[in-house]
Amino acid sequence: MDLSSLEIFRAVAHEASVTRAAQRLQRAQSNVTTRIRQLEEDLGVELFLRDGKRMSLTERGSEFLAYAEQLLALADEARQSMHPAEPGGRLRLGSMESTAASRLPALLASYHKACPRVALEVSTGTSHALFDGVRARRLDCALVAAGPGWAGELDGSGLRGEPLFREELLMILPAEHPPVHDVAEVRLRTLAGFARGCTYRQLAEDSLGTPLTVQEVGSYHAILACVAAGACVGVLPRSVLQLLGTPPLRSLPLAEVDTWLVWREGYATAAFERWRGVLGQAGD
C-alpha cells in the first residue's frame, strides 16, 4: 500500500467509476483497475461492489475511505510544511450554498491570484454535513452558519473556529400572502428548505413552530420558485436574494446569523493560513 494506491482508491470511490477516475487522474483505465485489485488483495477485503461499470463502496470500503482521506491529508500537510513560504498543494474547502453563491467567487479569485500553486477543491453542503466533513478530515476547513448553541459545538470537538460574516436571514412569502409584521402572522404551514442539518432551515422551523410540513429542495432557485408558486414560505440570506433577483415576493426579517470558518485544531498549512488571511480581510 502506498499513497498512489490511496489516491487511486479515493478517486474511484468519489467518482463511482473506474473510467471517470482514470480520466480525473490522467491514468490508463487498466492501470486503475489493476491498482484497485492489488489494494484489495493487500487488505484482504473487497472494497467495491461491481455493477457493470458502476463501482460502489462496500461497508469495509467506506471504513477504509475514512482512513485513506486522513492519510492523504496528512501527507499533503507534510509536503506543504516543507515549503511554508510558497503555498502549494491542495486545500479542500467546504461551504454552504448561500456563501458559495454570494461571497466565495470574489474571495476565490483573490486567493488564486495570491496562491496560484494551490489546488482548491470546493464542495457545498449543510452546516452539519460540513462540520462533520472537517472533523472526519474529508475537508480541511469549511464556512458554516452558527446556530443556537454554536459555541458549545466547538467545545471538545477537536475543531477551532472564528466568525467572518453576519448574514441577515429573511423569510420570504408569496406576493399574495397578506402583509405580515411577525412570524406569528404567517399563514402558510409549508416550508421550502434544504435537507436536515441546514442551520437556516432549523431557525425557520423553530420560528414557525408546529404543525409544519417541510418540502426539501436542492437550491435557492428552487426555494424561490416554490414560494413564488404560492404554496409555501422559504428562508434565505438577504445577500442571496439580492444576487439572484426575484419575482415579486414578500419578505420578513427572521434573524442575524454569523458565518464561521472552522478547521481542525493543529491544522496550519501555508495554503490554509493564506486563505484565513484572505477571509479576514473580507470580513473586516
Swiss-Prot record:
Domain HTH lysR-type residue range list: 1-58
A biological process from GO: regulation of DNA-templated transcription
Cited SUPFAM superfamilies: Periplasmic binding protein-like II, Winged helix' DNA-binding domain
DNA-binding region per Swiss-Prot/TrEMBL record: 18-37
Keyword Transcription attached: yes
Keyword Hydrolase: no
Disrupted-gene phenotype: The PA1225 gene, encoding a quinone oxidoreductase, is the most highly up-regulated gene in cells lacking NmoR.
MF term (GO), any: transcription cis-regulatory region binding
Cysteine disulfide links: none
Record keywords, A-Z: DNA-binding, Repressor, Transcription, Transcription regulation
Job of this protein: Represses its own transcription and the expression of nmoA, a nitronate monooxygenase. The nmoA-nmoR intergenic region is the sole direct binding site of NmoR across the P.aeruginosa PAO1 genome. Other genes seem also to be under negative control of NmoR, especially PA1225 and the hemO gene.
Family recorded in the similarity comment: Belongs to the LysR transcriptional regulatory family.
Protein name: HTH-type transcriptional regulator NmoR
Protein encoded by which gene: nmoR
